[in-house]
């Protein structure tokens, strides 16, 4: 039997769609067995069909995601063949970036979505006759390749990040437009703050306002080495300077 026809119940009942019956999404004709043969041609609903224009799901910005996806290289090159379900299995999909505080787990989860096709010859050939390129060879120019692969997601370098409302960019760019400039990430104004660390930054800002978000954000350049002792000494030094200025100001005021 085709593996695509087997639904893992453990994964399904942990997914975001676990409360639905099969026939909520599929034809009622599936209630009979054997299933009619013409059901193989059943048109599959996409995310917008259920979530578009629904205020209950407005915070997820499905319309903005759909627009970005439509402009992506996946959609423009493969049109109707490439749907939401090529990356997001409706039977196992669960929200991750918005709920998982463990960045490493988010990286693994999201990169697995990309690698399910880009490291699988069979799935890759479903959309093209081209040979599936070797990921390691194609990224041979990247310094510390293994560290990058385990520390950032594919979408950090391969998507356009314009819409501030969406957590994960869906406009996948052609390979010749991928980020290759180190300072895009390794700078105080890192693009990672608008992608991988976006949710954490938004949470800090919403909890304490804009200024708290600014003052509690990371001051280190992403990827730089850190020293806990120097961190503590820096805080003590800054606190001492502020205290000294305050005492000096108070004494001057008293003398006047």
Task: Please state what every model-predicted region is.
Residues 1-256:
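Short sequence/structural segments immediately N-terminal
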């Amino acid at each position: 039997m085709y593996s695509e026809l087997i639904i893992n119940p453990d994964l399904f009942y942990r997914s975001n769609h676990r409360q639905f019956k099969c026939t909520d999404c599929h034809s009622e004709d599936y209630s009979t067995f054997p299933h009619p043969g013409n059901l193989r041609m059943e048109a599959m609903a996409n995310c917008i069909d259920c979530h578009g224009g629904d205020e209950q799901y407005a915070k997820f910005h499905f319309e903005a995601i759909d627009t970005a996806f439509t402009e992506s290289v996946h959609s423009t090159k493969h049109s109707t063949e490439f749907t939401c379900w090529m990356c997001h299995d409706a039977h196992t999909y669960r929200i991750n970036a918005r709920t998982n505080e463990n960045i490493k787990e988010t990286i693994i989860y999201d990169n697995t979505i990309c690698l399910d096709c880009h490291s699988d010859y069979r799935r890759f050939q479903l959309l093209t006759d081209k040979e599936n390129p070797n990921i390691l060879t194609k990224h041979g120019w990247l310094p510390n390749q293994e560290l990058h692969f385990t520390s950032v997601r594919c979408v950090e370098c391969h998507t356009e990040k314009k819409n501030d409302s969406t957590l994960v960019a869906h406009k996948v760019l052609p390979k010749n437009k991928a980020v290759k400039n180190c300072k895009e990430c390794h700078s105080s104004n890192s693009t990672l703050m608008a992608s991988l660390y976006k949710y954490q930054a938004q949470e800090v800002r919403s909890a304490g306002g804009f200024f708290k978000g600014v003052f509690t954000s990371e001051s280190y350049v992403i990827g730089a080495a850190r020293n806990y002792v120097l961190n503590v000494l820096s805080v003590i030094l800054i606190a001492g300077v502020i205290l000294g200025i305050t005492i000096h100001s108070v004494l001057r005021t008293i003398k006047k």
